[in-house]
């Protein structure tokens, strides 16, 4: 089974992945789920948390990881992605790929014969969001009816948050400047999932105060995302500051609200030092939870 986006998962499957992640967090070592298995880790862009957490996850589950960075592998350059996928499938038991284009993941999954896990692409960041859900749960947040407010650029993280929120019955509010909204495809998918379960809601707004009001979770990410170097920096610095998570915005949320950021953070831009280092910030627990959630994902794909 592949994990390219979250929308192919049922609610029970997401909850089971989170439950298993909790188990792995409490019982970090002594597992052999990946015994005699080799996992390819493909990275087209630099990474700290994703690379460390997946490499450790494979090792701590008893497997072997094979790291390949851009420039060390033919991935659509001098060889088709289809041929690369076919060859890699002869050597490894699964492919974890952090790539620039979602199409690369689709091609790896289509032409390869082993499971493919999306470790991040331009459209989605499913493994990050599973770690976020673990962080919410361990901070006493019930998913059903939870108000999750996202602030900033409508990027891969916001796309995947919408899907996860829809699956679990959350009330998700995405606050972005106009013309920086999340993917229309992901909005459509989220609304379809909400209709399927008959629970939850999705709201898009350009008013951060509406999003923050009585929120249980406040979430932000960098204003210039992967592959967005062509964005107008001057325009961003003009229209994005009102979407910053700061003490004033946080005061509009519930008293026990938590703050999340997938990191790396541009402190002083999308989030202030005061907030990210404050008592309501769970950012570094969230970063650690990448390891535990990704162990659970690896377990899941080899069981299905």
From Swiss-Prot:
GO cellular component: cytoplasm
Residues annotated as binding carbamoyl phosphate: 47-50, 98, 125-128, 262-263, 290
Residues bound to L-ornithine: 156, 221, 225-226
EC number, as in UniProt: 2.1.3.3
Keyword Cell inner membrane on entry: no
Cell compartments where the protein resides: Cytoplasm
GO molecular function: amino acid binding; ornithine carbamoyltransferase activity
Enzyme class: transferase
Domain of life: Archaea
The protein's name in its UniProt record: Ornithine carbamoyltransferase
Native source species: Methanococcus maripaludis (strain C5 / ATCC BAA-1333)
